Amino acid sequence: MKMSDIMDIATSGLRVQRTRMNVTASNIANAQTTRTAEGGPYRRRDPVFHAQRVARPFASSLERSLRGVEVDSIASDPREPVTRYMPHHPDANEEGYVAFPNVNLVEEQANLVSSSRSFEANLLVISKVRSMAEALMRIGQ
């Protein structure tokens, strides 16, 4: 396994976790948005990931199993919005209920912490691979 393959895998993890943090931040920022351009309240979003091949076609079986990760799409949460009785709200329906986004702030904060920790882990991998490469270059000196 090449060090560049390890770096590619860790870098793909960094990109995915950055996207996950951005989507989570958007969910938190729009937790009270009752009207969007599409109509209706904001819908919570989640990134959908899939494995991505890293190795070359004629690599060994171990190297062929190496996979990075990439964002496939950003999916909207299918759960129904939360309704609250607020008759004076401009987006209230005839009965006085307003549809609010289905965003759970505790869940979003947990997602943010999880993606932050994963981002840090990928940075640590890159840092360790870099120091290993530097140590290898010093062997011949």
Locations of regions flagged by a protein language model:
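Amphipathic alpha-helical polymerization modules
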Residues: 1-141
